[in-house]
Design a protein with these regions (language model features):
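Glycine/proline-enriched, intrinsically flexible loops and inter-domain linkers
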Residues: 1-343
Length: 343
């Protein structure tokens, strides 16, 4: 219906509009806070730092996202190729824009990015990177949103859990708490930021795999308190009916999701192995990253992190908060809907 020049013209116009919209948004935030105050340092559980500060390129007017100071590449799998940082940036920019624009390359036209070579965010060839996509990306996102004074930390992790043997394998990511902001409380039991996965239905899970799902519930009071509360994480308990190898790749087990503007931190996550030893049960904290051989009857309990709160808790009253916040209808059971709507 349209020739190529017309189509290309529309495509360029969409990107031009996105660039102008993001540029206006950045100008507003910088005018409000001052570019010198838009900076943040956060850490992975192993202590690796992710540093961000903004500055302006005086020659072309672009805003520079400078990650200088970020830790060197790590001797683990949390290294993140630089494309992951770009993905986190474009995601955050689109989230901060309050206009209806499609996500496209124009969103990052008004910015430049500086990432140190051989760092956690731009590792050398040959470095392990599987955790960079599912863990480090979440920390980069938290760092950007905090630097812009937009939102407290979310759970900061995908809670990657796998198990299997030579005959089968299973992989899931587990929801947690969303961080609060200046205008709303965080949502409980939700996949946050750099992930869009959905967990297997309980009935399907138990039918197709040799497990019993003993518990999958909201982890009460795990979100940080505040004028607006962080969302709660979840509790997931799986009992195995045959011996398998189980692995967990997770973050926010050592460093809690931070609150903002006086809001309290969310609760750290915990991964437990309930091991049968004779007629006794051992409770073992397996840490954020582990691989264990579980026996029939053993259980793995994963408590995911809550989101950070926003604002001084003393300023919070249920009545005033409900006037300010429109709670979404919670997915799932009536019990979860009640928690989301009224608690």
């Amino acid at each position: 219906e349209f020739d190529l020049p017309t189509i290309m013209g529309y495509m360029h116009a969409i990107q031009d509009n996105a660039a102008d919209t993001v540029s206006r948004m950045l100008d507003r935030i910088i005018a409000k806070h001052g570019i010198e105050n838009i900076h943040c340092v956060d850490h992975m559980d192993d202590g690796s730092a992710i540093c961000l500060h903004l500055r302006k390129n005086q020659e072309n007017g672009k805003i520079i996202f400078d990650f200088t100071g970020t830790s060197p590449q790590a001797y683990n799998n949390l290294n993140a190729p630089h494309a992951i940082t770009y993905s986190a940036i474009i995601y955050c920019l689109r989230c901060m824009v309050d206009e209806d624009i499609p996500l496209n390359q124009g969103c990052i036209r008004p910015i430049e990015v500086v990432i140190p070579k051989s760092s956690l965010l731009d590792p050398d060839s040959g470095c392990a990177v599987v955790g960079g996509n599912v863990c480090t990306s979440q920390r980069v996102t938290d760092t950007i949103l905090k630097a812009f004074h937009v939102m407290a930390d979310s759970q900061g992790c995908c809670n990657n859990f796998t198990f299997g043997n030579d005959g089968f394998g299973y992989y899931e990511t587990i929801a947690g708490g969303h961080g609060a902001s200046a205008h709303w409380s965080g949502v409980s039991g939700i996949q946050t930021n750099m992930t869009n996965t959905r967990i297997t239905d309980a009935e399907v899970f138990e039918k197709r795999y040799p497990i019993i799902l003993r518990d999958f519930s909201i982890r009460d009071n795990s979100g940080g308190n505040g004028l607006f509360k962080g969302g709660n994480g979840v509790r997931r308990e799986i009992e195995f009916r045959i011996p398998v190898n189980a692995s967990i790749l997770s973050e926010r087990r050592a460093i809690a999701p931070h609150g903002m503007e006086g809001g309290e931190d969310g609760s750290r996550g915990v991964n437990l192995w309930i091991r049968n030893v004779g007629d006794k049960k051992q409770v073992i904290n397996i840490g954020g990253k582990a691989s264990v051989d579980v026996s029939s009857g053993d259980r793995i309990i994963i408590l995911t992190p809550g989101g950070g709160g926003w604002g001084e808790p003393s300023a919070h009253t249920p009545e005033s908060q409900r006037k300010k916040v429109v709670y979404p209808v919670g997915a799932g059971s009536l019990s979860i809907r009640k928690k989301q709507q009224y608690e």
